[in-house]
Amino acid sequence: MVVVGVLALQGDWIEHIELLREIEGVEAVPVKTEKQLESIDALIIPGGESTTIGRLIERRGLLEPLRDRIRAGLPVLGTCAGSILLAKKVRDRVVGPVEQPLLAVMDIAVLRNAFGRQMNSFEAEVHIEGVGTVHAAFIRAPIIEETWGEARPIAKLNHPLLGEVTVAARQKAIIATVFHPEITGDSKLHKLLVAAAKGRAF
């Protein structure tokens, strides 16, 4: 049995739990404490409000424990706000540079709210390297502006206003997506995370 934790401080963590429970051989658990973090084989950082999630991570004393486990090789999937929290550099489309707590474990720069407001949300088919085509929901989504070091793009999207943009990246056992696969019920990335937790090629 593979234990996959979902950071459950704010955001749409319940949708991830429900999707994980449909995968055979997986126990899906909410993670709110350092003790719960210690017992998992993989982690999902869900969408939500990245500044709020970051502050709650700090308040609960989870910032360093999360960084330590991820740097030690814990497989991680960060979706939407999760990709922002994983990034080493973050700015906002409207206000520019922002000050917010970050895990800062991934060599990516993220632009918050890149597609505009909630009314500009949309769904699209996205081809992800090594995964296949995922039906993705973009809700006040960021984009990955830059990758360097050990991170590399694994999915791009042609947008009518922004042109070609990076919407997913990978660094070792970490995957960041700017979209929500859980909202559309697409479990391909979740199954990839489970495979990584089992020690299969990632």
Swiss-Prot record:
EC number(s) from the headed UniProt entry: 4.3.3.6, 3.5.1.2
Catalytic activity line of the entry: aldehydo-D-ribose 5-phosphate + D-glyceraldehyde 3-phosphate + L-glutamine = pyridoxal 5'-phosphate + L-glutamate + phosphate + 3 H2O + H(+); L-glutamine + H2O = L-glutamate + NH4(+)
Annotated SUPFAM superfamilies: Class I glutamine amidotransferase-like (SSF52317)
Pathway: Cofactor biosynthesis; pyridoxal 5'-phosphate biosynthesis
Oligomeric and partner information: In the presence of PdxS, forms a dodecamer of heterodimers. Only shows activity in the heterodimer.
The family this protein is said to belong to: Belongs to the glutaminase PdxT/SNO family.
Record protein name field: Pyridoxal 5'-phosphate synthase subunit PdxT
